Amino acid sequence: MVTTPRLVSLLLLLALCAAAAGALRLPPDASFPGAQAERLIRALNLLPKDSSSSSGRHGARVGEGNEDVAPGQLLERRVTLPGLPEGVADLGHHAGYYRLPNTHDARMFYFFFESRGKKEDPVVIWLTGGPGCSSELAVFYENGPFTIANNMSLVWNKFGWDKISNIIFVDQPTGTGFSYSSDDRDTRHDETGVSNDLYDFLQVFFKKHPEFIKNDFFITGESYAGHYIPAFASRVHQGNKKNEGTHINLKGFAIGNGLTDPAIQYKAYTDYALEMNLIQKADYERINKFIPPCEFAIKLCGTNGKASCMAAYMVCNTIFNSIMKLVGTKNYYDVRKECEGKLCYDFSNLEKFFGDKAVRQAIGVGDIEFVSCSTSVYQAMLTDWMRNLEVGIPALLEDGINVLIYAGEYDLICNWLGNSRWVHSMEWSGQKDFAKTAESSFLVDDAQAGVLKSHGALSFLKVHNAGHMVPMDQPKAALEMLRRFTQGKLKEAVPEEESSTTSFYAAM
């Protein structure tokens, strides 16, 4: 009998897992990632939904009058959302659908908010993670122009990132938010499909808005966007180098509390938990027995593909799940806080808001069901989860693309320690000098809002008094971070430019 190297590797992985399980039994949900996805979604007081089987998403058309859009084309409308104060003028707010080419029927939904300041402000795109969570979570709870009050009215966010940028929020991959397809074959499973879709969208977006094509362009996002963003940035950069289409003026990208290098970041879970007194030393030593099989599984994932990647997900998440069994009701997005019942945050107003017929009519989504976080997208991306996306970043740094990795200090799930470790271990020409660079205070209003380390094109910022969602927890510091980063002045305090538009918003 001939045994293939791949089979030998998988058998060895199973043996390692069995050995570890002798000291620490696998949690009952370790082999059921769908259960973990639902638990994470319900903690936000959102309803887990399977976007691939949602009848309201199949065959529906975009906008009033069953308007449709041809493949490779974009349908956009100016938007004034219900709930805004009366008498507010046209603010340059847009919503639209992009019909993805090279798909069977996929359509990508987005919001675009022009800057409250100058047309020349940078264009920024924001990607929410999950995978499978809508970027509208960021629009209304983090860094968008407004927040939703309990009476469903909209309140201006004086620290919205549209104050200093022309910002795009995209629902992706297909099946997230208002993005949908009538054909399950359009489901994405890896970063190649995701980044190609986003690149195609940008090409058509800038044709629709040629007045912004010369503006600096930055990619931002958080959580699983630590996977999306490096792949997307590489796709844009390669497209520019090969003159594939419209040149996109990519200047940099920023990842907040992201998952980028799982081998390093999963190993940091127990160190962070011990440092924050979430677990005891005996727990630390017991749970650490899962680290060798996790590392081995991730190595197999990088060479053997899908089956090994699924095994890596299940083995490695045993580390996180084991910690969570010990921390009780602690909020894994912000360990300073307690979850109330199953709820760690209450984002339910978002689903109520998008259930309003007037809102749906204003943004042109017709009868498409809103999926705040999709379990089907989450599960479709599982074989992508344990892949290392750090590998593409050094080439971008060498070509002068600025990179900012930032992390709120109280997040467990994508903690600052794991992010700091992969940033420091990344091999590039400035690695040694970056390691030797002294940390400096990141000051906002003359108070320390974080600790910054920066050399060349690479910066790492640990944000104080923040959890997983930095723009929600520290909105002013997050806005100031974006301002300085896009101006290439992270180490400096940048004066806020006053304009009539800024004054108008500040008064509201």
Swiss-Prot record:
Cleaved propeptide residues: 20-80, 492-508
GO CC entries: extracellular region; vacuole
EC number assigned by the record: 3.4.16.5
Assembly and oligomerization: Monomer.
Species of the source: Hordeum vulgare (Barley)
Locations listed in the record: Secreted
Activity regulation annotation text: Inhibited by mercuric ions.
Main location: secreted
Keyword Oxidoreductase: no
Keyword tRNA processing: no
Keywords from the UniProt entry: Carboxypeptidase, Disulfide bond, Glycoprotein, Hydrolase, Protease, Secreted, Signal, Zymogen
Gene: CBP3
Similarity annotation: Belongs to the peptidase S10 family.
Entry binding sites for substrate: C414
Modified residues (Blocked amino end (Leu)): L81
Pfam families referenced in this protein's UniProt entry, alphabetically: Peptidase_S10
GO MF term list: serine-type carboxypeptidase activity
Glycosylation positions in this chain: N151
Signal peptide location: 1-19
Residues covered by region (Disordered): 48-67
UniProt-listed InterPro entries: AB_hydrolase_fold, Peptidase_S10, Ser_caboxypep_his_AS, Ser_caboxypep_ser_AS
Disulfide feature: C133-C373, C301-C316, C339-C344
Protein name: Serine carboxypeptidase 3
Catalytic activity: Release of a C-terminal amino acid with broad specificity
